[in-house]
Structure formats: C-alpha cells, structure tokens
Amino acid sequence: MKNLTIEHGSLNRSSDEEYSGIRTMGEHNQFINLVIHDVYHGLYINSSNHTLVKNVKVTGQGTGKLGSQGNGIQLVRTSNNIIEDSTISKTRDGIYVEYADKNEIRNNYVSETRYGLHYMYSNDNTFYRNRFNKNTGGAAIMHSKNILLKENQFSFNQGSRSFGLIIQTSTSNTVLDNEFYLNQRGIYLEQSTQNKIEGNKFFHNDIGVELWTTSTSQVFTKNHFEQNIANVLTIGAESYNQWNLNGMGNYWGTELSVLDLDQNQIGDSPVEYRSSLYKLVEDNELAYLFLKSPAIKIYEKINEVLSTQKVMVVDEFPLIEKEKKSVPWMLLFIPALAIAGWIFIKKRRSRLS
C-alpha cells in the first residue's frame, strides 16, 4: 500500500473492535508514503510478521485528548517488522509494542504523545536513531529484555514525573550512545536489573539518572554528565550498581575535580558525587516541578556546607575529556621573528655596502 491518505475513521471506544486507519493481519505487507489522521489507532499490525512501515505520517487529535484516542502505530503479537522514517504526533502512544519480538524501529520522529515508544512484554528489539521530543515520556521499556537502544535523541520531555527513558521491571537491555537533554529526568530506572548504560550524553536535564532502590546491578560506563541540576539521584535505600566497566568510569564535567597526573584520561583516584535533593523527591513528588528554582541551588549549597549530603555515586575510574592540542603561542611568533630578522640583515648589508 503506497501513496495514500486515510482519514475520518471511527473513534468509538464502546466497541470490542479497536478501530484503526489500517489494520493488517497478513504476512510480508508494506505500507509506504501514507498520511493517516482523525482515526483511533493509525496503523495496527496484529499477529502478522515481516511488515515494512516506511515514511508514514500519523497525526492524532492533540495532547488534550490523549486518553480518548489510540496509538500512532501499534504492534501486538508480531515479530520481524521494520518501522522506519515515520513521523507521529499528538496520539496516545507514538509506537506501542506488546508481545512483539525481534522488531527494528529506526529513524522515526515522535512528539506530543504520552509515551513516544512503549514496549510491553517485548524482547530482542532494536531501537535506533529515533527522536523523541516534547512527550510526557520519551520511551518506556516495561517487562522486556534484550532491547538495544542506540543513537536516539530524547529532548524536552517535561511535565509532572516526565522522563526521556524509563526502564521498569526489565532486564538485560543496552542503552548505547544516546543523547538526553532538557528532560525532567534523562533515564529513570525502577525494579530493573542488569541493564547496561554506556556512552550516553546527559546534559541540561533536571535529573540525569534517577535510580530507585529496587533497581540493582546496572552497569554505567563512558557516559557524559554535564550541567544537569542533579547528575544522579538514588531514591530509597542504597542500591548496588556498578559505575565502571573494564576500568572505564564516566565523565562528570566540571562539577567534580579529577586529578590525572599520568595523563591517561582516567582519574588517579575515585570520585564521589553527592546530593541532598533525594530527600525532597522522596518526601513529595511535587518537588520535581521546582527543581529549576534558584532555591534548589541554595538548598544544595547549605547541605554541602553542613555535610548532610548523601553519596549518590562512587566512580572508581572517573574519565577526563581529552584536551584538544593547541599550537603553543610562542610558535605563532616564529614566522614574524624570521621576517623581522631577514629585514634587519638586509638593511644592515645595504648600509655596509
């Protein structure tokens, strides 16, 4: 199916039928260059495999009606599908994946939804180079394992309890080389174990990483933290996670002083990241809404002076950004000195002659 516009489908929720602009239950179908709007679900792939969805645009009715409409693209009990180069906005969830394994979702743009991408009971999926902007939550991985999230962007996901990525009740997932910026929380982990968080950039978020005590045995390595209000918060009792792998920790920006006398870009001693904001978040969820307040910086500073902050992270092998080699300033004068010397010698010879 190619080059079609589909609109004005039923939005009735009282029927057992989940209405959608397109619903497929066959094998090896292709949906290319489609525009879908004013329907319940945009595209519903149900119990069918090997489907290609490419360059499909789905538009819902807006954030004010998220609860009364369906998802942009929905995959249920299906596998080996590709969703790529598509744009979804103003639906309930952008892409919803349930009991669906071995799918590839790449190069899509999702905005103004509840969750941009929502995995439930889905394993062995690949999630690559997607962009999630201005959603309540960028992506949600729930009750799933062995998912690879690589080179995605999560930005401006703001609101009450918002996040770029949530990993909940999930295990053995890899979050690699993604960017999290200007989110309320970059990554939020709850009741999850043995996930690998590597090479990601967290900058200008309210909270870079939020870890609840029910999340343990995560591995964090080669991540960059820069100018977040709180780089890491651990909520509840102490959780046991690993902040380095094979002698490679994380980059902590300018907040933590790291000494590197041997110039190998690895700190000579462990560093601790401390914060007192966990107290506010534990006591009252409304605290998330005030993290940008100037009073928060004062609160942190007071607790730092009083030594009442709690250790959030101990990084045994903190990393240091490699400085760009610059030309020594003295070298800039060598050409000028050579020219001046040549002029001086020439004038001296002319006088002698």
For every predicted segment, state its role.
Residues 1-2, 7-29, 41-48, 75:
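Extracellular beta-strand-rich solenoid/capping regions of secreted or surface-exposed proteins
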Residues 2-8, 28-38, 49-62, 79-92, ...:
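Right-handed parallel beta-helix
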Residues 14-23, 38-41, 65-76, 90-96, ...:
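Extracellular beta-strand/beta-solenoid scaffold signature
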Residues 16-18, 25, 47, 69, ...:
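Exposed loop/turn and edge beta-strand positions of beta-sandwich/beta-sheet ligand-binding modules
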Residues 25, 31-34, 43-61, 105-113, ...:
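Well-ordered, non-transmembrane segments within structured domains
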Residues 160-163, 204, 208-212, 217-353:
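Functionally critical loop-and-helix segments that line ligand-binding/catalytic clefts
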Residues 187-190, 198-211:
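Eukaryotic non-globular interaction segments with acidic/serine-rich, low-complexity composition
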